[in-house]
């Protein structure tokens, strides 16, 4: 969300696609996403096009949002029986790009897809549609296990569905340099992913946790 807003404020055309049933990205960008709002759920099921559901972020010029709703919680079950279930989002984005061109609108510079913290069909749809994966990882031991599983899934997607997909960026979050564990996690990630790990880390800070409530 912060990356998307920052890029939009430089004058770039940016869109955030929220496919997390919790809808935190939609909330953070002040986008309505109650159950009666047209959303990415309708797009994935083929009932609407992206241009029918996309909204302008009220607080950031040049930033568009395809919101999530709680309906996404059951979307994975509904998607199982659909044709090309792993490619629903990819095809919708391609159609939206073509529509923008026909409508005389400029091509978007960036599309961010906010995924749920799981590796189901929603996340697979994101991987098939994307070119790059940005992984935020908490500086905690169990996060390393999650990273390992995520990378296996990325490799599977590369092999079978999207060969252009690559892990381009890993960002350490909730990093506390005063703890040995955080330092060890950072060193472990840096050893295995020296090119992908950013030098910048987001520190553990209670004010960051409190910020969404304001």
Per-segment meaning from a language model:
Residues 1-214:
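P-loop NTP-binding core
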């Amino acid at each position: 969300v912060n990356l998307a807003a920052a890029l939009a404020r430089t004058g770039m055309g940016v869109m955030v696609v929220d496919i997390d049933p919790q809808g935190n990205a939609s909330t953070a960008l002040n986008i309505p996403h109650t159950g009666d709002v047209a959303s990415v759920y309708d797009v994935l099921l083929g009932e609407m096009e992206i241009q029918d559901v996309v909204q302008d972020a009220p607080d950031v010029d040049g930033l568009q949002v395809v919101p999530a709703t709680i309906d996404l919680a059951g979307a994975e079950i509904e998607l199982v029986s659909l044709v090309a279930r792993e490619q629903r989002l990819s095809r919708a984005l391609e159609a939206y790009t073509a529509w923008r061109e026909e409508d005389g609108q400029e091509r978007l510079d960036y599309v961010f897809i906010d995924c749920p913290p799981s590796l189901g069909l929603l996340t697979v749809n994101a991987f098939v549609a994307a070119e790059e994966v940005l992984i935020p990882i908490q500086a905690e031991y169990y996060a390393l296990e999650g990273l390992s599983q995520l990378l296996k899934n990325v490799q599977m997607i590369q092999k079978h569905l999207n060969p252009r997909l690559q892990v381009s960026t890993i960002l350490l979050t909730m990093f506390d340099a005063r703890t040995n564990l955080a330092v060890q996690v950072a060193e472990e990630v840096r050893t295995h992913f020296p090119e992908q790990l950013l030098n910048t880390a987001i520190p553990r800070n209670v004010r960051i946790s409190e910020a969404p409530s304001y």
